[in-house]
Amino acid sequence: VLIEVNFQEAFFQNYFIPVAFMSEAELDTNTLIAPAQFNGVSGYLVDALHIEDFRKLLFERIAASAELREFPHIIFHKSSLLGPMKYESSRFMGAEQSNTSIVYNETYVLKIFRRIYISTNPDYEINRFLTEVCRFENTPEYVGSVNLSIGEEDNITIGLMQRLIPNQGDAWNYFLKEMDEVFANLGRKKIKLSDIPDTEHYKRIRLQNIPHQIIDWAGLNLFQKVQQLALRSAQMHVALGSDTRNTSFVPTNFNGDYEVWLKNRLTYQFQNRLNTIENNLHKLEGESMELAKVFLNRKNEIRRRFLDFDWTKLKSERIRIHGDYHLGQVLVDHDDFYLLDFEGEPESTIRDRKVKQPPIKDIAGMFRSFHYAIYSVILNNGSKFPYERDELFVAGEKLYHFICGSFLHTYVDHVQKNNLNIGYTKEIEFLLQYCLLEKAVYELGYELNSRPRWALIPLRGILQILN
């Protein structure tokens, strides 16, 4: 069943529910939708994913790339890179916000998209492209998919099957533990905070050039992991920018249409954030309140920053990107990283998610994620470190600068060696600051609506960029 939900605010969303009938006698799930009668038998309409026979049917249809004769508009596909597949078992991985994941044979994961769009899902498009065209190994391998055909060109993606990646959790939790150890080292090693060196923000720095005081404090392993993640990020972008035939993926230049689209989108988003901060100002206190007032006082300067985008000065190229790239979208497997969930920004329309963007936008998202990891450790665990919170913030900013510099060196070095055109140094820095500001303003709306105490993090990020 495809459902259109209309909201009072004059917009709508589409959802997908696979529905089955179970008689009262065989009912073994609490996912009831409504009572029903079929051929005189009383029972209930239920979510079909909770019936193993239905999960098995999905698997077998994907494995055979076979259509259902009763529903010829449902397109099942299996990757040509895979051999025969036989159903053995299935279980739920756990419900998520916009999809439900089913683990098959402890080997594959079928992601059922609950929130759907009248278009193919970017996660399906990019995952299949990276697997079948690029042979990119550091993303879950594309196994198969389920799409609904609703016209000559329009398909709706309702399922994406991928190979299960054995892992030790996501990079967000991994780096949170690392950061906690780093800050614990301050007291453990009796480090004098004024002795911690700093570096210019966005300045690329080789591992061997990071000051020994930083390595002694944060550890070599942290920066080796940062560099490994930077390498995988660069390889992802090189792969996404490598095609010369598929128009959905061929790199393209900046142009006037993109500039108009970008400015319209960001000025609308910025006005939305201004309204949000004005309506939620009473929820803030202390430094968050002070920074929010500075934000409001400098709103015209921020708006000018967003409007200060001249495509004629940019020589780099745009490609399809991840679009919502942060530490939570990365799995850790021992000493390596796997990149996943290419759906794009949740607030964006499906059309906007497919617009080719500067790859640096993904890097800005990852930098904001590192900033969050540092600040969340201080905000949640700061009382256990023998320093004032403001002192920890200063130390954290210095660490953040070295993390960004180390990441950027590895990333830029790899993409330039592999002929992905991201521009020269000044253009990279302009795009990075522009995208960092966009990301931080985007985050601000989320924090104000859901956890105002954390609004401090994007507010500090915004003012850091402005200053």
Kindly label every feature range from the protein language model.
Residues 324:
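Conserved catalytic-loop position in the HRD/HxD motif
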Residues 4-279, 327-329, 333-418, 424-425:
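Conserved ATP-binding subdomain of kinase catalytic cores across diverse folds
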Residues 394-420, 430-467:
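ATP/Mg2+ or Mg2+-diphosphate-binding catalytic cores
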Residues 80-88, 273-319:
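An alpha-helical support segment within catalytic cores of ATP-dependent transferases
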Residues 301-305, 420, 425-426:
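Short, motif-level signal for alpha-helix interfacial/capping segments enriched in acidic residues
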Residues 248-267, 289-292, 296, 422-436, ...:
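Charge-rich, acidic-biased intrinsically disordered regions
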